[in-house]
Curated annotation (Swiss-Prot):
Organism: Mus musculus
Protein name: Phospholysine phosphohistidine inorganic pyrophosphate phosphatase
General function of this protein: Phosphatase that hydrolyzes imidodiphosphate, 3-phosphohistidine and 6-phospholysine. Has broad substrate specificity and can also hydrolyze inorganic diphosphate, but with lower efficiency.
Keywords, sorted A to Z: Cytoplasm, Hydrolase, Magnesium, Metal-binding, Nucleus
Positions that bind Mg(2+): D17, S19, D214
Organism ancestry: Eukaryota, Metazoa, Chordata, Craniata, Vertebrata
Amino acid sequence: MAAWAERLTGVRGVLLDISGVLCDSSASGATAIAGSVEAVARLKQSPLKVRFCTNESQKSLRELVGVLQQLGFDISEEEVTAPAPATCQILKERGLRPHLLIHEGVRSEFDDIDMSNPNCVVIADAGEAFSYQNMNRAFQVLMELENPVLISLGKGRYYKETSGLMLDVGGYMKALEYACGIKAEVVGKPSPEFFKSALQAIGVEAHQAIMIGDDIVGDVGGAQQCGMRALQVRTGKFRPGDEHHPEVQADGYVDNLAEAVDLLLKYTDK
């Protein structure tokens, strides 16, 4: 692998994943990953542009940012690209009225959306709400439509909480795709449109940006597909086999966000 100086040259903007990079979640709350609060502060004091890019779909953007602020992070709602607000914009633009299969924690994001006589299904990480009854109702809504539209907030396979690995929305999305014979539209990582909207928000071109995440496919692979560079942290859902993934090779592997920021601040101006 090329030297760090070569791999990080020309970086002007940084996209940061949240869960597994900044903090770990659990049923009882969230805890900051060691060194990450200081790492974000150092990044924001540097000339680099910073944007937070998350697939979080169990909390509203306001609640998510509030939790992070309580942990000590310097972050505001305006600095976060998240799938629920982006999905609401799409629904309004296209005149779509969703049947929602989502977590109660994110439902407030959809308060302004017309849900009468649904003409699409929106699915997110619904947690305990992923019952047979709820999945079957979403299936029925899709099958009743002449042109079924399924929108998924991300398509992650799993994520990590302090209690262990948790099934993410991707498996349920795939079940509905298979049962209905359709292809879902993904709003969130690794969708190219999602990454591009985050880059537009900080005015940085893909070749000048680097993604830092814990998901080898969604964060690293997705960013690289858009022309960005990407680092994987060995926190969150990272697994040792990720460094030998058959399809995705990160531009570098670091122990945590603090190490990534050390390297960025050391080499990006060189």
